[in-house]
Amino acid sequence: MEIKLNKYIDHTLLKPEATKQDIINLCNQAIQYDFATVCVNTCWTSLCKELLKNSNVGITNVVGFPLGACLTEVKVFETKKAIENGCDEIDMVLNIGALKDKDYDLVLNDMKEVKKAANEHVVKVILENCLLTKQEIIKACELAVQAGLEFVKTSTGFNKSGANVKDVKLMSEVVKTKLKLKLLVELELMMMQSQW
């Protein structure tokens, strides 16, 4: 059976200096390669909706990005506005400080409230593994399962490292079949697959 990798790719542009033309180019590439979604900041959702209207490409928006340190109410507001403007999926950033403080109720509530605000839309949580210990990664994955999210992701791309084989194996062991796993992978890191 042939696996179409392109349908698993969120073609992403989250740089603060991204221009309208950059977003147009991103959407054109996503259509050309039939990617799953474009992942953009919420200010670009309406433009992407217009550009992608005759395609099978969806729109992912980030909330609490890139730090995850904002109030849950802010993430909920961002989520509602993103969906109102036409986004299909939400990538929320984990409240890393709360996880490190072992304030698991806050972390769980943060995820649950975003999921609730997203209604039936897919919600992924970005863990930022390079800032977490092994035990923190495990706990974050367990909380994501408990919150009813669909995916856990490795990183924002705004910190010191993205996906690595060790973390991906750990995350997949924890979430097993309960959640899906998304990796932040730069093109040259695709060579990691040879290590599986």
Curated annotation (Swiss-Prot):
Subcellular location: Cytoplasm
GO cellular component, one term: cytoplasm
GO molecular function: deoxyribose-phosphate aldolase activity
Keyword terms of this UniProt record: Cytoplasm, Lyase, Schiff base
Domain of life: Bacteria
SUPFAM superfamilies: Aldolase
E.C. number(s) listed in UniProt: 4.1.2.4
Enzyme class, spelled out: lyase
Pathway this chain belongs to: Carbohydrate degradation; 2-deoxy-D-ribose 1-phosphate degradation; D-glyceraldehyde 3-phosphate and acetaldehyde from 2-deoxy-alpha-D-ribose 1-phosphate: step 2/2
Protein's UniProt keywords contain Cytoplasm: yes
GO BP terms: 2-deoxyribose 1-phosphate catabolic process; carbohydrate catabolic process; deoxyribonucleotide catabolic process
Catalytic activity: 2-deoxy-D-ribose 5-phosphate = D-glyceraldehyde 3-phosphate + acetaldehyde
Active-site residues from the entry: 91, 153, 182
Record carries keyword Lyase: yes
Transmembrane segments: none
Pfam families, alphabetized: DeoC
Record's function text: Catalyzes a reversible aldol reaction between acetaldehyde and D-glyceraldehyde 3-phosphate to generate 2-deoxy-D-ribose 5-phosphate.
Family: Belongs to the DeoC/FbaB aldolase family. DeoC type 1 subfamily.
Name recorded for this polypeptide: Deoxyribose-phosphate aldolase
Gene: deoC
